[in-house]
Every structure is written in C-alpha cells, then in structure tokens.
A protein has these predicted regions:
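N-terminal glycine/threonine-rich, aromatic-flanked beta-hairpin/loop signature
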Residues: 90-130
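A generic structural signal for short beta-strands and their flanking turns/coil linkers
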Residues: 72-74, 96-98, 107, 133-137, ...
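Amphipathic/hydrophobic helical signal segments and adjacent flexible N-terminal regions
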Residues: 1-73, 81-85, 192-227
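Solvent-exposed loop and beta-edge segments used for protein-protein assembly and interaction
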Residues: 68-72, 94, 103-105, 131-133, ...
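Juxtamembrane/interfacial segments around transmembrane helices
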Residues: 59-68, 87-95, 152-156, 186-187
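Tryptophan-anchored aromatic micro-motifs
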Residues: 70-93, 113, 173-179
Length: 227
C-alpha cells in the first residue's frame, strides 16, 4: 500500500519538478507566475504515481529500500487439507487441489481461489511483516459453490485464511483457513506461474502440461496479464 514514504517522495518530486520548470522558463521562483506550470507538473507526477502503483513498485530496483511488499502476482497451485467429514462416507475428504489467482498493485490485492466445485474471492486483506522478517497475508473471503451443489452438499459461506509468505520470489505460501460453517484446515500454495487464469479448467490444463509448457506460460510475464 502507499505509505508516508511514498507520498512524501511524490510530493517532493512535484516540488522539484515544479521549481525546475520555473527555472527553465526563466521565471522568478517566488513570482505568482509559478501557477502556470503547476498543472503540467501535477499531471506528470500523477502519471508517474499511477505507473508506479500499477507496475513499477514490483521492479527489483525498488525492492527493500523503497517498497517493502512481496510480489504475489500470478496463479498458484493450492492444496487444501480440510477437516470436513463427508456425510455420505463418514470420512474426512481427500486433499483438495485448486488454484489461487492473485492480482496485485502497490495499493490493492485481489485473491481468487478456484476448485472443481467452487470459487472464492477476497473481500478484504492485509499484508504484514512480522519481527522475524516473514511476511504474512490475511484474507477474508466469500465462497460460492457451483449452483448444482447449493442446497444439497454445500452453501455460500464466508471464511478467513492466514498464510506465511516463504522463500525468495516468493516460492510458496503456507498456513490455515477456517469458515463460518465450523470447518477448518491447512493450505499450501506453490508452483506459481505468472499468467492469471479466469477459470479452474484453464488453470488445471496449464498446470498439467509438460514442464516446458509451464515455463513458456511463466515467460509471458505478469506485467500485462496479471496486474
């Protein structure tokens, strides 16, 4: 998200650019004529801020010293271990494989989980950096099962998840989730590709292609397809 450091930097850039424009035009820096170039300068800096918020924040040159926020963009393969008991068998369900799509800017984060039977989307989120230098993301979400399952085996519900962001890149996310239906479980996200998929079937097909195909998908980049 935009912090005081970012806002101060953009304000400072505006002032410097403004004074530079006055100097180039030969205007006295304390003259009332400073108003003339101000609109141009504000528009220019506003454009820079928009580009920075959408793309440039994730560039390596800004990592660590100016932007302290992990780049989670892309599609992750998710494994869910639920404690839900299937009433038809009396047993705990097998691990559920799905795909998590993250679209991100400096100021926003959108998370979608897609499985063969339902879709979840984030309602609110927070990313924090703990004292151990590990980032953690918390998400509140709404889950909508496929229409043919509603009223039979599953209903629309809400839940929360809490994940640790691990490795350089990062490489994976691990944590747990719980729902307002009284169920809970573990979750692991790994094997990220940079492309964002809009449905479970597309993601499933891509992740089940040969490894070389996955590399080709990754090389397409997140800049255009997964903001």
């Amino acid at each position: 998200m935009l912090t005081r450091t970012h806002i101060s930097a953009f304000v400072g850039l505006t002032i410097v650019a403004w004074l530079l424009a006055l100097w180039i035009q030969g205007q006295p820096l304390l003259s009332l004529s400073f108003i003339r170039p101000f609109g141009i300068v504000v528009g220019l800096v506003g454009g820079v801020a928009a580009v920075f918020n959408k793309w440039a924040w994730a560039w390596p040159i800004f990592r660590g010293w100016f932007v302290d926020r992990p780049d989670l963009r892309g599609t992750w393969k998710a494994t869910l271990l639920s404690d839900w008991i299937d009433p038809s068998t009396g047993n705990r369900v097998d691990p559920i494989v799905g795909y998590v799509v993250v679209r991100q800017t400096l100021a926003s984060l959108s998370v979608r989980l897609m499985t063969a039977e339902s879709r979840s989307h984030s309602i609110s989120h927070g990313i924090t950096k703990e004292s151990d230098e590990i980032f953690r993301v918390a998400v509140v979400y709404r889950n909508e099962p496929e229409i043919e399952l509603q009223g039979k085996r599953s209903e629309i519900h809400h839940g929360s998840l809490w994940l640790e962001i691990l490795g350089e890149g990062p490489k994976c996310m691990k944590g747990h989730y719980w729902t307002d239906r009284g169920t809970r479980g573990g979750m692991q996200l790994c094997d990220r590709v940079r492309r964002c998929f809009d449905c479970y079937e597309y993601a499933h097909d891509a992740f089940n292609c040969p490894e070389t195909s996955l590399e080709n998908e990754s090389q397409k980049g997140a800049e255009g397809t997964c903001p």
